[in-house]
Amino acid sequence: QGIFIMVTEQDIHFMRYAMKLAARGTGWVNPNPLVGAVIVRDGRIIAEGWHERYGGLHAERNAFKNCQEDTVGATMYVTLEPCCHYGKTPPCTEAVVEHGIARVVVGLTDPNPSVAGQGIGILREAGIDVEVGVCSEELKAQNRVFLKYIQNRMPWVVMKSAMTLDGKIAAYSGDSKWVTGGPARMRVQEMRRTYMGIMVGSGTVVADNPMLNCRLEGEVRQPVRIVVDSGARVGMDSKLVTTAVTYRTIVAHIATADPDKLRMLSACGVETLLCREQNGHVDCVDMLSKLGGMGIDSIFLEGGGQLNETFLRNGLIDEVYAFVAPKLVGGKEAKTPVEGQGFARMSEAVELKNVEVEMVGKDVLIHGLIER
C-alpha cells in the first residue's frame, strides 16, 4: 500500500495551496508544526483551514468548521499526517472518518514518534484511500524548525548578521547605527516575529542596550529574549532588565555568577537559567538543550562575533541570513560577524546550501542553510 502513488497534477496543485495556508500560522503555532488542509469535491475547493495558533484547532478541524457543504465522498489534502491522539484537541482522524471523506492526500508523515504512520493506518482501516508524500521535499523545508525540534528536542538556530561590503558589523569605535537601510531593518522585525527566541551575548547588551522585541504594527507573538551571560553581567538599568515584566527574558549563566545579582534579576522578572560551564563560559549545547526542554523550538541569533563563533565552531547553526550593505568602513579593529581565531584552511569553511540572494532596499540579503 502506498508504494505506487497515483499523484496527479491536481494533487500537487491543491497540496501547494494547502502549504500556502499552512504558512499563515508562521510565528503563532510554535512549537507545533505549520499545517494546512483543503477539502475538494469534483476539482473544486469546498473548504479550507490551517493551524492558526498554538493550542487552537488543528488545520483539519478548522477546514470542517469552515465547510458549508456535504463532505461525504470528498478528498482532503493535508500537509501533515492527521493526528490520532488526544492532546490539546481531539484526534483529527476521528473528524476525517466522521465527515465521510473518501480520499486523503498527505504531504508528510508525522515525525513525532507517538504518531508516525498511525494516523494514516487508522484512516486506511476505515476504508479511506490515502496517498502519502505529495510535495514532501517542499513541506520538509517549510517545517524544518518543527522537524528538528520534534526529533532532537533542540531548537533550530538561525544566525542573522548585517555587515558592510568589507565584512564589518560596526565601525572600529563600536558605532553600528546603522549598517543597513530601513527596508532591511524592517525585514529583521518580520524575522523576529517568526522565531520563539531571540538570542544575544552579554557584549551586545553592554554595547547596544537593545530591546530585542518585535516592533511590527498589529498583534504579534513576542519572542522570548535570551542573553548568554556567563557571569550575569547584564546591567540592572538595561532595557532588557527594566522591561522583563512585559517581555519574557532569560539570562543563561554559569554556577560562578554572583548569587545576589541573580536574585536581583529574578526580582525584576528575569528568568535565570543555570547552564554547564565550558572554558569559563556557558556551554551552548547544554543551554540549547535546556531551552528546547522549555518548549523553545527556534532561536534567532543576533549575537556579536564571539557568540556567533562559539555556535559555528560547535555546529549549532542551521540557517543563515546575512545582510550586506554597499558601503565600506574599514579598520582592522572593526568587528566582524564571526570573531575568534577562525578555521585554519578554506577547506574547513562552513558552506551554505540552497542559497538565495535578493535585494532588500539598497542592501543584499544572502540566505542559506548550513551543509550538514
Regions from the PLM with identified roles:
Residues A18-A22, D42-G49, E138-Q151, V241-V245, ...:
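A short, flexible N-terminal coil/short beta segment enriched in small residues
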Residues N112-A116, V132, I150-M154, K177-G181:
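Short capping loops/turns at secondary-structure boundaries
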Residues I39-L139, V224, I250, A257, ...:
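Zn2+-dependent cytidine deaminase-like catalytic core
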Residues Q1-I5:
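Short, Lys/Arg-enriched N-terminal segments with co-localized hydrophobic residues
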Residues A102, I128, R153-P155, M196:
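Short, well-ordered coil/turn segments that N-cap beta-strands
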Residues G27-V29, G56, I120, V134-A162:
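Proteins enriched for Cys/Gly/acidic motifs involved in redox and nucleic-acid/cofactor modification
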Residues G36:
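Helix-turn-helix
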Residues V7-Y17, L21-G25, N30-N32, T71, ...:
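Enzymes that bind and transform nitrogen-containing heteroaromatic metabolites
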